[in-house]
Amino acid sequence: MKSIVFVALFGLALLAVVCSASEDAHKELLKEVVRAVVVDKTDAVQAEERECRWYLGGCSQDGDCCKHLQCHSNYEWCIWDGTFSK
């Protein structure tokens, strides 16, 4: 009887240690994912600030849009300006 209780308590202690280690690994993985998402968003914002806006991209003035596009005054997105050239 004593040995069964001892084995059960030992099993519970071992399970607690394994779960704790698993939870720590899960937290570290979650931190890495959040860091990756934040870095990707930061890089995307910087890229948008450096580059022109493509067709239907948000804008506030014509200079925000790429070549042959203009900023639509009502909807504030880049639309084709009607010109053709190379």
Swiss-Prot record:
Ranges that cross the membrane: none
Keyword Signal: yes
Entry comment describing in which tissues the protein is expressed: Expressed by the venom gland.
Signal peptide positions (record): 1-21
MF terms in GO: ion channel inhibitor activity; toxin activity
Compartment(s) of residence: Secreted
SS bond partners: 52-66, 59-71, 65-78
Keywords: Disulfide bond, Ion channel impairing toxin, Knottin, Secreted, Signal, Toxin
SUPFAM superfamilies in alphabetical order: omega toxin-like
Domain notes: The presence of a 'disulfide through disulfide knot' structurally defines this protein as a knottin.
Role summary: Ion channel inhibitor.
Matching Pfam families: Toxin_12 (PF07740)
InterPro entries documented for this protein: Huwentoxin-1 (IPR011696), Huwentoxin_CS1 (IPR013140)
Species this protein is from: Cyriopagopus hainanus (Chinese bird spider)
Lineage: Eukaryota, Metazoa, Ecdysozoa, Arthropoda, Chelicerata
Protein name in UniProt: Omega-theraphotoxin-Hhn1f 2
Residues making up the propeptide: 22-50
GO cellular component: extracellular region
Keyword Transmembrane helix: no
Principal place of residence: secreted
